[in-house]
């Protein structure tokens, strides 16, 4: 958010620019007390994105976010959980797997490309259907 404010202040974002924030499904999905602070920060990021999108749409500066749920990364594989816990977590996803890093990249590339020229203020949820339940 601070970087975006500085870019705007210094007029470094030209017309026809696109800004994509990497947020989280936690910002739009039910949370537990274990990750409430994380969810609040992601909800705040999404609110900032929508406000910036509305404020700068007339200059054709687009703001969007990619909101992934669990992504299969090295960091995720280093979390010490049992196979039973992992299976219980995966059971929450209608598509029975975690996301892949390249799926986040593809959504981001789309939002930065001309293919999404009419897209602003949008959160793309990459969550295997998690937020449907």
Language-model segment annotations:
Residues 4, 41, 49:
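Active-site helix of classical SDR
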Residues 9, 54-55, 117:
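Alpha-helical segment proximal to the catalytic Tyr-Lys
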Residues 24:
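Residue(s) in the substrate-gating loop at a strand-loop-helix junction
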Residues 28, 67-78:
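Short, flexible catalytic-loop segment of classical short-chain dehydrogenase/reductase
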Residues 30-39, 51:
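Active-site loop-to-helix junction immediately N-terminal to the catalytic Tyr of the SDR YXXXK motif
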Residues 57, 62, 119-121:
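Short, small/polar-rich loop/turn modules that mediate ligand/substrate recognition or access, typified
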Residues 93-104:
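A conserved structural motif in NAD(P)-dependent oxidoreductases
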Residues 109, 120-133:
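Short C-terminal tail/terminal secondary-structure segment
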């Amino acid at each position: 958010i601070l970087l975006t404010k500085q870019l705007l202040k210094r007029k470094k974002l030209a017309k026809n620019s696109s800004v994509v924030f990497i947020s989280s499904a936690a910002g739009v999905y039910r949370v537990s007390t274990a990750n409430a602070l994380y969810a609040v920060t992601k909800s705040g990021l999404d609110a900032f994105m929508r406000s910036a999108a509305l404020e700068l749409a007339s200059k054709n500066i687009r703001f969007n976010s990619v909101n992934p749920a669990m992504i299969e990364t090295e960091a995720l594989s280093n979390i010490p959980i049992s196979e039973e816990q992992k299976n219980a977590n995966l059971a929450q996803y209608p598509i029975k797997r975690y996301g892949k890093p390249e799926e986040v990249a593809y959504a981001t590339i789309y939002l930065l490309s001309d293919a999404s020229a009419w897209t602003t203020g949008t959160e793309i949820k990459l969550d295997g259907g998690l937020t449907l339940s």
